[in-house]
Structures are given as C-alpha cells and as structure tokens.
Amino acid sequence: MGEKPGTRVFKKSSPNCKLTVYLGKRDFVDHLDKVDPVDGVVLVDPDYLKDRKVFVTLTCAFRYGREDLDVLGLSFRKDLFIANYQAFPPTPNPPRPPTRLQERLLRKLGQHAHPFFFTIPQNLPCSVTLQPGPEDTGKACGVDFEIRAFCAKSLEEKSHKRNSVRLVIRKVQFAPEKPGPQPSAETTRHFLMSDRSLHLEASLDKELYYHGEPLNVNVHVTNNSTKTVKKIKVSVRQYADICLFSTAQYKCPVAQVEQDDQVSPSSTFCKVYTITPLLSNNREKRGLALDGKLKHEDTNLASSTIVKEGANKEVLGILVSYRVKVKLVVSRGGDVSVELPFVLMHPKPHDHIALPRPQSAATHPPTLLPSAVPETDAPVDTNLIEFETNYATDDDIVFEDFARLRLKGLKDEDYDDQFC
C-alpha cells in the first residue's frame, strides 16, 4: 500500500523552549480579492506562563537602510502594518472558529495550546528583498512579514529574545489564470535633412513568463533611410518603484544580448532573439529586487507585482515590473529603441500541492512549462513537521522537532536572526 499524503506543519520554539509556534505554511497567497488568512497555534509551558498572557503579533515592515547604520535611536525601518492577537486567555468573542488544521493541532498538543488568527490587508505589499552588496552585513533591505509570540502581562511590556518566538512569513502572488495580450511596440525614426525613415517593430510571443523561462523577442527592421544599423541590443530590465516617503524608480538590467547584426540602407531585417533573465547571472548587483527570502533558502528575481485596480500605491512599499528593451545602434544617427512590458511570476500551484519554493530551494517544485528551467537542485527543508491526514483520528501525528539552533551550536544572542 502506498503512503498517505502528509500535512506539512512548520514549528519553531523559543530559545528557552517554553513557547512554540506552529504554522501550516509560511507562504500566504494574495488573490487580489482576498489574502490567505494566517492561522496557527502557540503552545506555552503553564509553569512559565504563571499569571501572564500570551500575545501574538503580525508585523509588515519596510527596511530601507542597512541595519548597521541604525545609530542614535534612528532606525531605517518603517512599520507598514501591525496587528496584535491575545491567544491566552482567549477573548470573549474570537474573530472566527478554529480551522481544521488548528483543531487537529489543539487535540494533539493539549490544553496548553491556543489558536491565533490574522487577516492580512489586501493593500499591503508582497515580500520583496533588495539584494545586498558583497560587503553588506545585517538584515537585508526590503519588505518582510514577521510573526512574534511572547508572554507578558501587557502588550507594552518588553520581552527578551530568549523568551519569544519570531518567524518570518511571506506574502506572495502567483501568475494570473488569464494573461494579457501579446506585447508589441513599434516606432519610426526620421532623420535630419532626409525624408526617409527607419522603422522598428518588436514583439514577444506572450505576456506571461515563468521564472527560468526564456523570452523570444521578435525584431523586425525596415530601413528605408540612408543610415546603417550597426548592431542590435536586446535587454531585460527590472523596474522597482520604491513607495515610501516619496516615490522613486530604480532600474537594473538583468539580461542582455548584443549582436553585430547590421541592416544596410534600403533593406529589411527580421530575427528572433532568445534571452533568459536569471538571478544566477546577477548575484553581484546590489539593490536588485528579489522575492522575499527565508534563511537557508535561495530565491529568485522578484516576481512582477500585480496591483488591484483602485489600490493605494503609496502604501505598497516596492512595486516590481519588467520590460524588454530593443535598441538599434545607428551610425551617425543616434539610437532607436522600443520597450515591451511583460509579467514574470511563478505558476499557480494546484490546491493539493504546497506553495512553491524559489527555483533553487523548491521542496515540491510547481509544474512549469516545458521551457521553464529551474536554476539549481532543491535542498531538503528541515524546518517542518509532517503528519498524516487522517481525519478520523489524530493519534498518528508525529512531530519532528526543529533543532537547528542546537545542531548549529548557536548562542541566544544569535537568535536575533529571525529567518532561521
């Protein structure tokens, strides 16, 4: 008989092992009309709790400066959203009844386990990390979501890192089911003292591409002028709109093809260029937008941001988009170029499959198009527990303790890195 499918549950304990948080997943999908709810369970040692309360907080923050620059009480960090939940003692009117997974965990863990629940607002940004430079230390810049559980008499009471649990989650988007129209653009260049023109037309074979999938750029040139096109450059550029105190746009080339294809006067030219944007070719570019990163996992170029119509862009943190630029280098006539916007995302997984990891860290990689190529092999994810989906009984649940701190020999002060 085959094995029953397992339910993956993430587990993390405080350094003093008095508090443990359980989550069914760490990636929460933004469906544009709603966001997956954050539901989990916190287990607390009653002898440690005493007369205190158990609080869980969800924070969305935008770090826009290096952590080592935080001096004199100034922090290069802005909290975009903070929500608090009192897990114990339970409030008289809980926001919703426990989910099926919470019920199973509560039965397994006993009376000292308590559920918590958060709703992520739709207008919050997705998790994005800005790639640090080779010499940068500390937490990377970008947008992240963090769950923190602690025991205290009140929310205002300061808790020690040793007595709390911090766990980073991600808000993600997947490719839409119905892609947009095929991107195309054209332009005509007229030169001084001449009535003849140079016409450039470019198009992509589709609008939506998956990470690792090559782009086919169709370039058609009609040169009725007296100028000569010396070479053709095709590049993919990432645009990151940083919306914080003011809006600024940063662009970074992530792939480029340059060919010495010449187009003589009074002639035409047509060619398909293939180009693939990959993070593996851009490891040294500081400030490049990446999908939100969890420690011990690799990631990929940031997915395109899909904004719901009417959303307030001022609170969106980082908006990511991509364009293909086709440029003709003309002798003694300047450059002629067009841009083609496209969407770069992960495919939407099936409901019964766990949310996909980045290409180089996918425990269960999503089904990609035949042309989509993962970058590297997948390591084993040890930060999870699995139990069988037996709805009749929960006696067969087996927890696999996540003991990375003890295995690595880390000290309590190292716990400040919440990505572990």
UniProtKB/Swiss-Prot annotation:
Modified residues (Hydroxyproline): P176, P181
Modified residue annotations for Phosphoserine: S360
Tissues in which the UniProt entry reports expression: Found in a variety of tissues. The short isoform is the most abundant form in all tissues.
Transmembrane parts of this sequence: none
GO molecular function, one term: phosphatidylinositol-3,4,5-trisphosphate binding
Gene3D superfamilies xref list: 2.60.40.640, 2.60.40.840
Location of Phosphothreonine modifications: T393
UniProt-annotated stretches for the region Interaction with TRAF6: 240-409
PTM per Swiss-Prot/TrEMBL: Phosphorylated at Thr-382 in the cytoplasm; probably dephosphorylated at the plasma membrane. The phosphorylation does not regulate internalization and recycling of ADRB2, interaction with clathrin or AP2B1. The ubiquitination status appears to regulate the formation and trafficking of beta-arrestin-GPCR complexes and signaling. Ubiquitination appears to occur GPCR-specific. Ubiquitinated by MDM2; the ubiquitination is required for rapid internalization of ADRB2. Deubiquitinated by USP33; the deubiquitination leads to a dissociation of the beta-arrestin-GPCR complex. Stimulation of a class A GPCR, such as ADRB2, induces transient ubiquitination and subsequently promotes association with USP33. Stimulation of a class B GPCR promotes a sustained ubiquitination.
Residues that bear Phosphotyrosine: Y48
Subcellular location: Cytoplasm; Nucleus; Cell membrane; Membrane, Clathrin-coated pit
Keyword Transport found: yes
UniProt keyword list: Cell membrane, Coated pit, Cytoplasm, Cytoplasmic vesicle, Hydroxylation, Membrane, Nucleus, Phosphoprotein, Protein transport, Signal transduction inhibitor, Transport, Ubl conjugation
Location of the motif [DE]-X(1,2)-F-X-X-[FL]-X-X-X-R motif: 396-406
Region of interest (Interaction with AP2B1), ranges: 374-420
GO-annotated cellular components: clathrin-coated pit; cytoplasm; endocytic vesicle; nucleus; plasma membrane
Effect upon mutating E386K: Abolishes interaction with clathrin
Function as written in the Swiss-Prot or TrEMBL entry: Functions in regulating agonist-mediated G-protein coupled receptor (GPCR) signaling by mediating both receptor desensitization and resensitization processes. During homologous desensitization, beta-arrestins bind to the GPRK-phosphorylated receptor and sterically preclude its coupling to the cognate G-protein; the binding appears to require additional receptor determinants exposed only in the active receptor conformation.
Domain notes: The [DE]-X(1,2)-F-X-X-[FL]-X-X-X-R motif mediates interaction the AP-2 complex subunit AP2B1.
Family: Belongs to the arrestin family.
Subunit: Homooligomer; the self-association is mediated by InsP6-binding. Heterooligomer with ARRB1; the association is mediated by InsP6-binding. Interacts with ADRB2 and CHRM2. Interacts with PDE4A. Interacts with PDE4D. Interacts with MAPK10, MAPK1 and MAPK3. Interacts with DRD2. Interacts with FSHR. Interacts with CLTC. Interacts with HTR2C. Interacts with CRR5. Interacts with CXCR4. Interacts with SRC. Interacts with DUSP16; the interaction is interrupted by stimulation of AGTR1 and activation of MAPK10. Interacts with CHUK; the interaction is enhanced stimulation of ADRB2. Interacts with RELA.
Protein name: Beta-arrestin-2
